Amino acid sequence: MPPYAAELARIEVLLQKLCTESTNRQLGQLAWEHIATGGKRLRARLAVQTVCAHGARADLGIAWGAACELLHNASLIHDDIEDGDRFRRGKPALWARYGTAQAINAGDLCIALSYAAIASVPVSDAVRWQLTSVMTQASRRIVEGQAAELDLLSSGVPSWRDYADCVEGKTAALFGLPIEGAALIAGRSCAEAMALAHRCRQLGLLFQIQDDILDLFGSNGRDMPGSDLAQSGKASAFVVEHLRLHVGDVDWLMRILTAPRKETSRQQIDEVIQRFADGGALAAVWQRMDEIRCELVESQEISREPALAALVQEFVAAALRPVEHTRPRAIADGLGSNG
């Protein structure tokens, strides 16, 4: 049996229970239908494993892991609506099957249920209040990050800092969240938990870049390769790095990025992907990933705690493994010679 399989199974049971026992059973079933499509349950794993890394029992992280997964899935439901993605995890997105209005409601329900899950965390009222505060702050960051992403191209060519700031709010907040809450559950101070969460948000940046790579050079369960690229007004790590390297391509790429999705052809997307690969953006993105990895695993907050360091290394490997085949040979050779 895989590590923490029992705890993850209990999280799954709790997720289904919270959704299906909703006052509006039809809406609860919609929320559960989305959650049950799968996913890697990374936030649940982070919650349970971080509790253990701090020396506490794994079962103390079950309800917190469910709370984090509910907020994460709420963000996915809303994200699919805003991006117009008709597929999620290889299946029809909730809005594409049941309409935008009910999908919004299902996402909102997941947010509300995340707080219901916190009520089940077996800690003192004081710690439970801290968890509620942490959840609220993460929710705010996610919404602000999503709004910033939608406006990323409206003020000109985005920098890497602009891109990272968006990810910091949208994706990274959902990686810092389970770690911060788990640290609180295990008895760490608010300051210690916050410092760990701030550092571990870099995991979210790695996983977002992974998603950017899979969108172009792999499969991320959406309706077509380049789905994010075709989405009007959406910038990725590749857009940022390509425009840094090829300023003369600004007008060409911006026309494609800001065109309505239905007006973006398969040929245009293929051309963009080819230019990203040939023009150095792929190599530049990989260099960024390696820099983030080194900064994270070598940081004082992580390296001084062996159990936590091992956990972070495990999740860094999980971020890199699905896209390792896209790593340019020159970068791979360089890592080998340094290893």
Predicted region positions:
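Hydrophobic alpha-helix feature that most strongly marks membrane-spanning transmembrane helices
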Residues: 208, 218, 243-247, 258-262, ...
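Short, charged, amphipathic alpha-helical segments
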Residues: 194-197, 287, 309-314
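Short, amphipathic C-terminal "tail helix"
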Residues: 303-339
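A structural signal for short secondary-structure junctions
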Residues: 231, 291-294, 303-306
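Mobile late-domain/C-terminal helix-loop "cap" segments
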Residues: 251-300
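Charge-rich, solvent-exposed alpha-helical interaction surfaces
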Residues: 14, 271-275, 311, 334
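Mg2+-dependent prenyl diphosphate-binding active-site environment of isoprenoid biosynthetic enzymes
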Residues: 3, 9, 13, 17-252, ...
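A short structural micro-motif
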Residues: 52, 138-141, 202-203, 259-263, ...
